[in-house]
Amino acid sequence: MEPSFKLSSGHKIPLVGFGTWKAETTLVGKAVEVALDAGYRHIDCAAVYLNEKEVGEAFTKKFTTEATVKREDVFITSKLWNTFHKKEHVRPALERTLSDLGLQYLDLYLVHWPVAFEYTSNDIQTSGSTQEFVSIRETWEEMEKLVDAGLVKSIGLSNFNVQGLMEVLSYARIKPAANQVELHPFLSQPELKKFCDKHNIHLTAYSPLGNGAFVDNEEVGAIAKKYNKTIPNVLCKWAIQKNFSVIPKSSTPSRVAENFDLFNFEIEEADMLFLDKMDKNLRTCDPAKFWGVPLFN
């Protein structure tokens, strides 16, 4: 049985998910089908990935046409994009995501970034956008209403640091159940983990493979060889043993299945400590570089 973590909302999140970031529209549907067939029961989506319609087609095929997987057995996450932080835009943005995914509800809906862009249309804008001040409180209060309406089961945040989390906790009627951030041995974020553990906020690791940073790493390679596993297996298992959920991504069917092969081994404590000590604050997804917004400095 795949391990899961009970969120503060009372719902369980499976610790191994399938990520759809940077997945090409022509490949993502098949990849999601392969993931569900391989046993994944946690699929991570976002409006800004511009592939939710294709993911939705895979859901319809598996949940309805073939009826090989039950909707209620799959934990599905999506995210509110930066352009839709104003209170009048939050619910319509979710409704577009639900329509694209072919779903009645989401298991988890996240505020994708603690940054708001100026709203110009319902189209997703990623670059050249003007920042606009919208308080996270305004956005969060609308997120809470989505839970009240039964459209989402849990709500959370993404890319929030300790300061941002403290702010939301100070006024939240419904506390954030999760915070999705970049996490891997080169960026293990111990202070963030400590804070989230204390406040029962679950951490999901995106880019758990470090966006290729570990491909030729001999030390992690040696650990992988010891357990007769791949480097991605070791990186994901490291995260799971720290109670993070992970959302590795791949469009290669064999690799999709391989990345799920995590439940027949345990990393020994000495190796876990060795991986912990590799931390060098290497952030591969930094808005200071692509938006000029130093969120993490």
Curated annotation (Swiss-Prot):
Active site (catalytic residues): Y49 (proton donor)
CDD domains membership: AKR_AKR1-5-like (cd19071)
Key words of the record: Cytoplasm, NADP, Oxidoreductase
Gene disruption: observed consequences: Cells show a decrease in the ability to reduce both glyceraldehyde and glucose in an NADPH-coupled reaction and a decrease in glucose levels. They grow normally but form long unbroken streams and huge groups. They show normal adhesion but a reduced motility. They secrete low levels of countin and CF50, two component of the counting factor (CF) but are responsive to CF and partially responsive to recombinant countin and CF50.
GO cellular component terms listed in the entry, alphabetical order: cytosol; phagocytic vesicle
Localization annotation: Cytoplasm
The protein's enzyme class: oxidoreductase
Predominant place of localization: cytoplasm
Residues reported to bind substrate: H112
GO biological process: cell motility; glucose homeostasis; negative regulation of aggregate size involved in sorocarp development; protein secretion; response to bacterium; response to oxidative stress
Binding site for NADP(+): 10-19, 207-259
SUPFAM superfamilies linked: NAD(P)-linked oxidoreductase (SSF51430)
InterPro entries with a match to the protein in the record: AKR (IPR020471), Aldo/ket_reductase_CS (IPR018170), NADP_OxRdtase_dom (IPR023210), NADP_OxRdtase_dom_sf (IPR036812)
A Pfam family the protein falls into: Aldo_ket_red
MF-aspect GO terms: aldose reductase (NADPH) activity
EC numbers, comma separated: 1.1.1.21
Transmembrane parts of this sequence: none
Mitochondrion found in the keyword field: no
Gene3D superfamilies according to UniProt: NADP-dependent oxidoreductase domain
Catalyzed reactions per annotation: an alditol + NADP(+) = an aldose + NADPH + H(+)
Similarity comment: family membership: Belongs to the aldo/keto reductase family.
Protein task: Catalyzes the NADPH-dependent reduction of a wide variety of carbonyl-containing compounds to their corresponding alcohols with a broad range of catalytic efficiencies. Probably affects several metabolic pathways in addition to converting glucose to sorbitol. Affects group size.
Record protein name field: Aldose reductase A
UniProt source species: Dictyostelium discoideum
